[in-house]
Regions:
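Short, structured helix-loop element that forms part of the nucleotide-activated donor/catalytic region
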Residues: 48, 157, 221-244, 255
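Aromatic "clamp/platform" in nucleotide-sugar-dependent glycosyltransferases that forms part
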Residues: 271
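Carbohydrate-associated surface elements
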Residues: 154, 173
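Short His-centered aromatic/hydrophobic patch
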Residues: 92-99, 117
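Membrane-proximal helix-turn-helix segments that form the acceptor-binding/catalytic region
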Residues: 131-148
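Short hydrophobic beta-strand element within catalytic cores of glycosyltransferases
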Residues: 288-291
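A conserved mid-protein helix/loop that constitutes part of the nucleotide-sugar donor-binding site
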Residues: 19, 190, 194-213, 230-233
């Protein structure tokens, strides 16, 4: 099959959607399908068509406003429609980008149409009323999609609340062996590592505030890129006078592995997640984790038999210190994560594409 995956955020940015799209594309290619990735990229000024990570990738400039993403030019739309006219399957990965457009074009070009939720639009509570109006409007087009994949129980509930149709629950797959080479019993004491995309919903500001208030010895390393300058300035203002907190910026996978190996604890302070792919990948390291007690993380860690890794980041510094000491008393262990594997996920999606 000829397949087009569409996203508004992609590598080299670090995050769950980016990895989901790349992993899905790579696995479908390995199965013999012809796959391209179409990216509405607000950080590029020119249209590009190249091979990235072994995958044909088309990047077009977009206009980004209040979380919404729109194609900026007729040239970008023309290229998209050319791709739509030649594929059998289209798979969208952002409800804020082309959801209505792809539904309207389906009858013209005759492709099968799929969607993955990735938290929908509710990563923060800002503009909540407008977000609800938008979701209500988009739900009218959900019936044009052969399947709307919900990546978590929370997303499935949201979809049902807004009366989306053609729903299927499917946990995103990831590289469940990504950090398996790491020895969980080798670490530098009091080193905490947080990695991934830096954004408001990731809870980095709250993380820095909490650790900054702590009097015990620690070294917090934060890996990732922030595209919101105003938000990053708020974080930096608190952290700049605390030598225990260090921002390392963007790092390669190998560099991230080195940082994880050195860490005593991995920290996931997210306020909201569509799924939590980075958390699942990190479980393959066997390292002890401190993850915010949000619905998605609770679902994953409870399912994996690791509820002790949950912590309410709204608690105070004393509670954090208690949690750290509790975790230090527990043995390290690696668990079987095969049901979260990208191979399993891509098999299910491939069958969906085929109507099975």
């Amino acid at each position: 099959m000829k397949i087009l995956l569409i996203t508004s955020i992609y590598l080299p940015h670090i995050g769950g959607i980016e990895l989901y799209v790349k992993n899905l594309a790579a696995n479908l290619i390995a199965k013999g399908h012809e796959v391209s990735v179409f990216v509405g990229d607000r950080f590029v000024k020119k249209i590009s068509d190249s091979v990235e990570y072994g995958i044909k990738t088309i990047r077009v400039p977009v206009f980004y406003f209040k979380g919404m993403t729109y194609l900026r030019s007729k040239a970008g739309r023309k290229i998209l429609e050319k791709e739509l006219s030649s594929v059998e399957v289209v798979h969208l990965n952002d409800v804020k980008f082309l959801y209505k457009f792809l539904a309207q074009k389906k009858s013209i070009y005759g492709y099968k149409l799929f969607f993955s939720s990735h938290g929908f639009i509710f990563h923060t509570k800002s503009f909540l009323f407008l977000k609800k109006l938008y979701m209500k409007r988009m739900s009218k087009y959900s019936g044009f999609y052969d399947l709307n994949y919900c990546v978590s129980e929370n997303d499935l509930k949201i979809a049902k609340d807004f009366k989306f149709s053609n729903l299927k629950m499917l946990i995103p797959g990831c590289d469940v062996k990504k950090f398996s080479v790491i020895d969980p019993n080798k670490f530098e004491k009091n080193v905490f590592v947080c990695f991934g995309r830096i954004a408001k919903n990731k809870g980095i500001l709250e993380l820095v505030k909490l650790f900054n208030s702590c009097s015990f010895d620690f070294f917090l390393k934060i890996i990732g890129k922030c595209d919101d300058d105003a938000y990053f300035q708020k974080i930096s203002f608190i952290a700049k006078n605390d030598s225990r907190i260090e921002f390392l910026g963007y790092k390669t996978d190998e560099e991230i592995k080195d940082s994880i190996q050195a860490a005593e604890f991995l920290v996931f302070p997210s306020l909201h997640e569509g799924f939590g792919l980075t958390l699942v990948e990190s479980l393959s390291s066997g390292k002890k984790i401190i993850a915010n007690k949000i619905e998605t993380f609770t679902q994953i860690l409870t399912d994996c038999g690791l509820p002790e890794f949950l912590f309410d980041f709204s608690d105070d510094k004393n509670s954090l210190q208690v949690k750290i000491e509790e975790l230090r008393k527990l043995p390290t262990r690696k668990i079987n994560l095969e049901k979260y594997s990208v191979e399993y996920m891509s098999d299910v999606i491939e069958r969906g594409y085929m109507g099975m």
